[in-house]
């Protein structure tokens, strides 16, 4: 059996990196071709007299694994709701300035020149609040077994990639789809109580409501952001609006299943070929424990219509480290994922729910 094209590419990329960084790996390990045997490739790596080659292999493998995990993670269905990276600091000061109010022109108003016109400025502080690590332990036995065949080596590398990627993907997916639920529970998002969509007719009725709000959100209004709801008495209302290309729909799969694709396409003026990226279908809006039990019930939420800016998500660190433990001859690989995962009180956003939140807090 010979190595697959993908495996050849990955292994030869590792060798190229060794040449670039001047390590000894490329001096012992050959270029992999269709006719290279696993013995020719693996023997220099697992040679007990040349442990530095194995160490180089692990270091180079870490880079290949990281590249694969990074590419897959940042191409996940909800990844484009994330903002720019946040390289420094732990907090972001997010500011919104209300539109200036007009005043009538008066040719005799000389005193107005010295009058102070205060801008209405709203500020929210968002913090880095998710610092997670995903770990994989590699034993000497696993390495030896990996070099018994090309298929075993490919399975070994794929297993590491999938373990780290799946862990990060699941957490990121749940964090993103959990933001509307978190805001709903906190009284920090507008909502409307609807009839539970159980058939095509009730599902279409929901879409009609959303279509009306989709149009209204494009006009300056104080009706679709939660700033005043959260800040309470004494605060000022924010006048906000959204460009149509910035409005997205997040809908539960049970409701989406009741609708024809054309219904969503027509309702939100989206070409069928461009529905992905504007309409996000999620399994549901609940949050779950590791054993599958419900941690936070979000089953009452059926859909969300919001500006993309509602999702205040930024990655600060996404990197890999490794540690060799000679005591038990294992190698630990760590994927570090540090992020800010918050929602905005400035953004137009609305939840469509079959029940009031606890506690209740909407004027919709």
Segments predicted by a language model, with ranges:
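Extended, compositionally biased alpha-helical segments that mediate assembly or anchoring
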Residues: 1-67, 72, 265-364
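Short glycine-rich, low-complexity/disordered patches
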Residues: 26-30, 70-79, 173, 184-185, ...
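Assembly/oligomerization interface modules of large self-assembling protein complexes
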Residues: 51-136
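A structural signal for well-ordered alpha-helices, especially hydrophobic packing surfaces
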Residues: 61, 65, 111, 164, ...
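Residue-level signal for secondary-structure boundary elements
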Residues: 69, 165-172, 176, 215-226
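Long, contiguous amphipathic alpha-helices that act as assembly "spine/axial" helices in icosahedral shell
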Residues: 122-192, 332-335
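Extended helix-rich, non-globular scaffold segments
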Residues: 192-200
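Extended oligomerization regions of viral-like shell subunits
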Residues: 202-318
């Amino acid at each position: 059996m010979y190595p697959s094209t993908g495996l050849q590419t990955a292994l030869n990329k590792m060798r190229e990196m060794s040449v670039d960084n001047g390590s000894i790996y490329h001096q012992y390990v050959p270029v992999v071709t269709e006719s290279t045997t696993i013995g020719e490739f693996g023997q220099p790596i697992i040679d007990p007299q040349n442990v530095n080659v194995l160490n180089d292999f692990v270091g180079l493998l870490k880079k290949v694994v990281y590249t694969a995990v990074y590419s897959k993670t940042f191409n996940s269905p909800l990844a484009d709701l994330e903002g720019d990276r946040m390289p420094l600091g732990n907090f972001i000061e997010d500011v919104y300035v209300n539109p200036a109010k007009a005043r009538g022109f008066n040719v005799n108003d000389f005193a107005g020149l010295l009058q102070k016109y205060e801008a209405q400025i709203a500020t929210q502080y968002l913090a880095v609040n998710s610092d997670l690590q995903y770990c994989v332990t590699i034993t000497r036995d696993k390495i030896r077994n990996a070099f018994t065949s090309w298929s075993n080596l490919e399975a070994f590398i794929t297993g590491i990639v999938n373990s780290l990627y799946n862990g990060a993907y699941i957490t990121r997916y749940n964090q993103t789809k959990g933001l509307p639920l978190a805001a709903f529970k906190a009284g920090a998002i507008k909502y409307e109580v609807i009839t539970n969509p159980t058939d095509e007719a009730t599902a279409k009725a929901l879409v009609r409501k959303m279509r009306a709000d989709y149009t209204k959100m494009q006009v300056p209004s104080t009706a679709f952001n939660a700033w005043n709801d959260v800040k309470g008495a004494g605060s000022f209302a924010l006048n906000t609006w959204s460009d149509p290309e910035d409005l997205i729909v997040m809908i539960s799969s049970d409701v989406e299943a009741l609708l024809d694709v054309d219904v969503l396409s027509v309702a939100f003026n989206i070409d069928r070929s461009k529905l992905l990226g504007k309409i996000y279908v999620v399994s549901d809006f609940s949050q779950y424990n590791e054993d599958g039990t419900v941690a936070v019930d979000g089953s009452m939420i059926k859909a969300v219509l919001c500006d993309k800016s509602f999702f205040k998500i930024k990655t600060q660190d996404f990197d890999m480290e490794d540690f060799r433990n000679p005591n038990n001859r294992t190698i630990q690989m760590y994927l570090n994922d540090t992020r800010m995962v918050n929602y905005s009180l400035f953004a137009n956003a609305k939840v469509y729910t079959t029940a009031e939140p606890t506690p209740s807090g909407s004027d919709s």
